Amino acid sequence: MRITVVQCDTGKAIGTGRAILMFINGGGLTDINPDFLRTASLGAWLHLRGRNYTAVNRFFVFKADGSFAGTQATTTDINLSRNADEYTATATFEFSDPADQLISSGCATSTATRFE
């Protein structure tokens, strides 16, 4: 999956990244990301209608010194392609400190291609 972090109000790209997601039959979701300052994420997905899905996931975030920085929660709206091998998505995310107080939020877009 290719991720682009965007300004929520304008859609202007401000950063990019990659991840691998695994959608598990029955509604489970996990992802891995090459960023060493975070854990893999766990979450769930739900079929809405047609080729539209929603997913939520959460992971732990760490500071450069290895101390716990908080959590990030992401909600993603997914549009699956007709052949079910690709998708496009928009997402919102929230970063909370170790006391679960919201610190910041943002938006992202992503594209993904199935592999087996």
Located regions from the model:
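Well-ordered beta-strand positions in beta-sheet-rich domains
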Residues: 18-20, 42, 73-77, 105-111
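Sequence contexts marking disulfide-bonded cysteines in secreted/extracellular proteins
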Residues: 7-9, 46, 106-108
